């Protein structure tokens, strides 16, 4: 069973390399959209945007997460909560996929919060005072990013639109782009939102490598 898991993880690594090469050699773009809720003139749709950039990013995520998973299968093998760790790790990866593929700000917020929640649980994995304090710092910094994403959603609401690919600096308020950049700075640990990154080292070593 362990060998099958390792093979599947290696397959993800090769799949990631394949997606990177595919994204680098294609210019095609596909938008899949379905209406989830509709009331009179207001509707909410679920969209998936697949273009060269999202394919490359998916490839990068799969390559890194697959490599980390192969390492984890050896490094975390004797941990009591080994299965729980892997479930949290792949919930983290799925949340990243949400942010890559879905151009709707509401659904991006779900992926964003998924990253925040799984980051908190992974940093607090060892359940001691240091890891819990580090997890709380990580969570609070992510809440700043959540607030900024919610602010961008409210700005987009004034435009009667939540879809990122319809954003145009010539038409839409430039403050939306600025707020989204600031939100991204909290997640990527840019100054002045970088305090959580060294604190996240309290997580298991493979998590630190994945986050960095």
Model regions and ranges:
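Core, highly hydrophobic multi-pass alpha-helical transmembrane subunits of bioenergetic inner membranes
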Residues: 1-212
């Amino acid at each position: 069973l362990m060998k099958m898991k390792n093979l599947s993880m290696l397959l993800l690594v090769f799949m990631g390399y394949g997606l990177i090469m595919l994204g680098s050699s294609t210019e095609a773009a596909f938008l899949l959209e379905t209406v989830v809720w509709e009331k009179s003139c207001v509707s909410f749709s679920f969209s998936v945007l697949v273009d060269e950039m999202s394919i490359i990013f998916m490839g990068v995520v799969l390559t890194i997460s697959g490599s980390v998973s192969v390492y984890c299968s050896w490094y975390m093998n004797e941990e009591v909560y080994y299965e729980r760790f892997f479930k949290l790790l792949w919930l983290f990866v799925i949340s990243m996929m949400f942010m890559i593929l879905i151009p709707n700000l509401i659904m991006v917020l779900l992926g964003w919060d998924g990253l925040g929640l799984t980051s908190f649980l992974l940093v607090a994995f060892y359940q001691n005072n240091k890891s819990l304090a580090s997890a709380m710092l990580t969570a609070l910094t992510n809440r700043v990013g959540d607030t900024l994403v919610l602010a961008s959603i409210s700005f987009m609401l004034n435009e009667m639109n939540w879809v990122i690919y319809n954003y145009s600096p010539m038409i839409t308020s430039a403050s939306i782009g600025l707020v989204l950049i600031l939100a991204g700075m909290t997640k990527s640990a840019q100054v002045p939102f970088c305090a959580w990154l060294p604190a996240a080292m309290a997580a298991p070593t493979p998590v630190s490598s994945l986050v960095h």
